């Protein structure tokens, strides 16, 4: 399954990718809070220094898996990411509100988020999804669909990561 390209060279999120994302999101949605936390714990397992990027974790003695602020943040990020992926084909672009994208861009810029951070997060997202789905549902095509959706969300955030003029 190849990703299609538009006339301007942009990657088009196709019907097959959309179907895979929608089908898998339907399975995961009911457990979004738990999966969001697992997603962030995986990020911190891969890149422990990432914890320091979150002010609410810096001086906390609460174990990560019990931290209420992390739980709330993790679920919010996971749901927004998955919902943006689920809407990608219908909208033809990332559907996160422009004000939200601007805020995300500014926040990621302020905390020094770099390409490597997005890569770790993307890897953790794919691993979380893989573990959340029944084994017979996960496939190379599923992985590619989610990777493309994540890639387009990251591109939208990066476009907003610019210092104030």
Swiss-Prot record:
The UniProt record lists the keyword Acyltransferase: no
Location relative to the cell: Cytoplasm; Nucleus
Cofactor: heme b
GO CC annotation terms, alphabetical: cytoplasm; nucleus
Sequence motif Homodimerization, location on chain: 45-49, 115-127
E.C. designation(s): 1.7.2.-
InterPro entries: Globin (IPR000971), Globin-like_sf (IPR009050), Globin/Proto (IPR012292), Leghaemoglobin-like (IPR001032), Leghaemoglobin_Fe_BS (IPR019824)
Xref: CDD domains: class1_nsHb-like (cd14784)
A molecular-function term among this protein's GO annotations: oxidoreductase activity
Keywords recorded for this protein, A-Z: Cytoplasm, Heme, Iron, Metal-binding, Nucleus, Oxidoreductase
Gene3D superfamilies associated with the record: Globins
Tissue: In embryonic organs and at low levels in vegetative organs.
Subunit structure: Homodimer.
Protein name in the entry: Anaerobic nitrite reductase GLB1
Gene: HB
